[in-house]
Amino acid sequence: MPYDKPHARLPVTVLSGFLGAGKTTLLNHVLANREGLRVAVIVNDMSEVNIDAALVRGGEAALSRTEERLVEMTNGCICCTLRDDLLEEVDRLAREGRFDHLLIESSGISEPMPVAATFAFARDDGATLGDVAELDTMVTVVDAANFLPELAGGDELAERGLAPYEDDERTVSDLLVDQVEFADVIVLNKLDLVDSRAADGLRATLARLNPLARIVAATHGRVDLRQVLGTRLFDLERAQQAPGWVRELNGDHVPETEEYGISSTVFRSELPFHPGRLWTFVTEELDGGAFGRVLRSKGFFTLAGRSQVTGLWSQAGSVARFEPSAVRDPEAPFAQELVLIGVQLNADRIQTALTNCLMRPGERPPDVDPFPAWDTYGSDDFCAPEQQTGHAPTPVDLLDTVRTREDAQVQAV
């Protein structure tokens, strides 16, 4: 069935996914089966020689000069250094009025949220991309064979030579979770490389990480065009509420998938954490296997001795980050609100362990706090450091053995 153009503004689909997941293969498939659509394409690759663009040109989807236009963006990733270029290219393509849809294939190391934010970015004249183009669908392509092993690892992008800027301290697991949690559609690709039970378990994991996303099965990037174009699924407010940890905190519990052992638990308390005991839990116990395999945990926490600040807790795979989030509201009912998602979780043990990390009646804050000081930038309303600097603080690597507090690999800005 031909795709009807229902928008006055140019609808945009953004393809995200880690390197090798199959974004370009999916892009080739869409272009080869576009059913008469006039499609403009923006591709972005990290290398000086744009490999992804070369694959699109040389693949089975021949680009017609009269129907498609390919725009290459090199020397950076969409989410950071090339945002101005992205603004200009999307604006130009939209104003030409010659295309039914725009596909943006982001770099394998790009997070989708900043790409979406680009559409609301106001220029000097007050105009935004949203005036001429409309985000239609955020698509994340997942490699069925490698997603869980990569999520469990603690590799930094820099260790693989993938960091787009010098002080980028993001990890592969950070990126994978960000890409999944902000998706409207998750294309589960390369299913021919895993058995049916592994595929079902991965689906359950993805559904737990992002309960609102559509999960589309694919082999060699082959999907129905209508699954990724013209879905009208993207909504910023909905996207911000899509991650499983947010829905759990809001009371929208995702049904347990006991068959695959995927579950979650929510920890809440009005008491602050004892910094030393929490540090021990995070660096020595959380990834030790006694609680099951914790794939993702996130939420808000408070430390004794700095109770005026609410911290943001974010863990993906074997890496955890702790950073200031906001000045704590003294009227807030809870000091701790954490969600832990994983495989074969022992919820009772987790609850007991975290309870043991809380301050006890009559206990005073310790003189030694192993968490580095938080710089609140002198503001009563501040963002997490990654929002201000473009990258997150150095993580706690849960796979490393913490020998002393001084040499622990953590930095909270």
Please annotate each region the language model reported.
Residues P2-Y3, E48, F147, E156-E337, ...:
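C-terminal accessory "lid"/substrate-recognition subdomains
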Residues P2-D174:
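Nucleotide-state-sensitive switch-loop elements of NTP-binding domains
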